[in-house]
């Protein structure tokens, strides 16, 4: 059998996710190898493997952020960022660190909050 967007929505909600109709369609398009608009079981397994990987990665990000948010104020300083990245297995040049800070530090306060951090990391 095949899984439609409606059925995928039911499955995702049972897993504690709350995707929109558009997100469900994107998920199906992402793994719909034969382009028929539904996903079969192997395609479904591929999708679930990606989702689990994303979830684990987000947990890793939270953990890394917590480790380097020394005073628990919800920010990591620009100086701490290279240590965070190394901790996540990302070896970066000074230029790359500067670029991330420029991208992430929206309010130009020299610190990166958790949301800014996740946005940059998920874009990698």
UniProtKB/Swiss-Prot annotation:
GO molecular function, one term: enzyme regulator activity
Gene3D superfamilies associated with the record: EF-hand
Tissues/organs with expression: Not detected in the organs tested.
SS bond partners: none
Binding site for Ca(2+) 2: 32, 34, 36, 38, 43
Binding site for Ca(2+) 3: 69, 71, 73, 80
Residue numbers binding Ca(2+) 4: 105, 107, 109, 111, 116
Binding residue positions for Ca(2+) 1: 2, 7
Occurrences of domain EF-hand (ranges): 1-18, 19-54, 56-91, 92-124
SUPFAM superfamilies linked: EF-hand
Source organism, top-level taxon: Eukaryota
Pfam families, A to Z: EF-hand_7, EF-hand_8
Entry-linked InterPro entries: CALM/Myosin/TropC-like, EF-hand-dom_pair, EF_Hand_1_Ca_BS, EF_hand_dom
Modified residues (N6,N6,N6-trimethyllysine): 91
Gene Ontology cellular component list: cytoplasm
Keywords on record: Calcium, Metal-binding, Methylation, Repeat
Family under the similarity heading: Belongs to the calmodulin family.
Record's function text: Calmodulin mediates the control of a large number of enzymes, ion channels and other proteins by Ca(2+). Among the enzymes to be stimulated by the calmodulin-Ca(2+) complex are a number of protein kinases and phosphatases.
More info: This protein may have four calcium-binding sites.
Identification of the protein by name: Putative calmodulin-3
Gene: PCM3
């Amino acid at each position: 059998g095949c899984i439609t967007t409606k059925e995928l929505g039911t499955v995702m909600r049972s897993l504690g996710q709350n995707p929109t109709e558009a997100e469900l369609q994107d998920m199906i398009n992402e793994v719909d190898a034969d382009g028929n608009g539904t996903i079969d079981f192997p395609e479904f397994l591929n999708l679930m493997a990606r989702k689990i990987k994303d979830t684990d990665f987000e947990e890793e990000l939270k953990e890394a952020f917590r480790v380097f948010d020394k005073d628990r104020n919800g920010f990591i300083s620009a100086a701490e960022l290279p240590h965070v990245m190394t901790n996540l297995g990302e070896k970066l040049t000074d230029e790359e660190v500067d670029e991330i800070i420029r991208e992430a530090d929206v309010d130009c306060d020299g610190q990166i909050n958790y949301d800014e951090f996740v946005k940059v990391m998920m874009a990698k």
